[in-house]
UniProtKB/Swiss-Prot annotation:
Keywords: Iron, Metal-binding, Periplasm, Signal, Transport
Domain of life: Bacteria
High-level lineage: Bacteria, Pseudomonadati, Chlamydiota, Chlamydiia, Chlamydiales
Signal sequence bounds: 1-21
Name of the protein in its database record: Metal-binding protein YtgA
Amino acid sequence: MSFFHTRKYKLILRGLLCLAGCFLMNSCSSSRGNQPADESIYVLSMNRMICDCVSRITGDRVKNIVLIDGAIDPHSYEMVKGDEDRMAMSQLIFCNGLGLEHSASLRKHLEGNPKVVDLGQRLLNKNCFDLLSEEGFPDPHIWTDMRVWGAAVKEMAAALIQQFPQYEEDFQKNADQILSEMEELDRWAARSLSTIPEKNRYLVTGHNAFSYFTRRYLSSDAERVSGEWRSRCISPEGLSPEAQISIRDIMRVVEYISANDVEVVFLEDTLNQDALRKIVSCSKSGQKIRLAKSPLYSDNVCDNYFSTFQHNVRTITEELGGTVLE
C-alpha cells in the first residue's frame, strides 16, 4: 500500500518526517561547530541538499559536515576562516557543480581537487538527463526534480562505496532505501500537482530556481517535448539571485502575469522580497494578484531536503488550486 494513501499513514508520515528532521539536523553538522566523535573519516558536502542524502547513505559510519548551511546563498558564498581546514581533513568533498559554487575562493579549492565529487558534471558525463541552461549558463537547481536528484544520489553512493569499500553493503542498502522513497515522493508530487487546473499552472518566483520542477511537475508531455514548458515559469532574477533587478525585469514579469491571468506569486525564503512586492503593486488595476501565504525553499532547506521538497509541492499545489493527495 502506498505510504500516502490513508489518513492513518498521513499521520505516521508527518511523525516520521519530524524524526527525520531531527536526525538529519544532527547528522549533518554545521561547518561552524561541533568536533566529531570519530576523527578518522570525514565527508564534506557543500550544501544541505547534498548532506541530507549523503548522511542517509553513510549512517554513523562517517562524520558528515556541511559547508554552506542555513540562510546563506550558495551562489555567492565565499570561503571563511576554517573552511580550508575542513576541506583538507575531509576524505571526500561533494559539490553540486553546474556553476552553483562559482565564487573565486570556492573554485580555487574545488577545481582540480582529486577529493571532489562534482555531481552535476557526473550527470553531464553520463548524459542520463537533459540538464537545463539559461543564456549559455547551466542551471544548477537539479534537486528540485526528484528524478534528476535521484540520479545524483546514485553518484553519491557510488563515490562513497569506491572511497570506503569496507562499508559497501551498508551504503548500498541505505541508498536503495532512499531511492525507493524518492520514487514514491516523485509519484506523489506528480499526482498532486496534476490536480492543478491547467490554466493555473504558471509559477512566478523570486529567481529562476524552479525550471527543473516546472518541466517535471507542471508541464504536459507535449510541452516537455516541444520546449513550451518554459512558458510555465518566470522570475525577475536569473539563475543566481546576485544581480540587480531592473525596472525592465519587473515589467517583463508584470506582463507575463497579465497575459496568463496569474493570481499568485511565490516568495522564496532567503531572497529579498522587494522585487515581488513591486510586481504585485505594479500589476494592472482590476487584476487579482497576491503573494503566496508561505514561501518556497529554493537554495536551502527548512528541516531537511525531503520535507522541504514536500513543503514546496504542498504550497504550490494548494496555492494554485489543486489538491494535495495523501
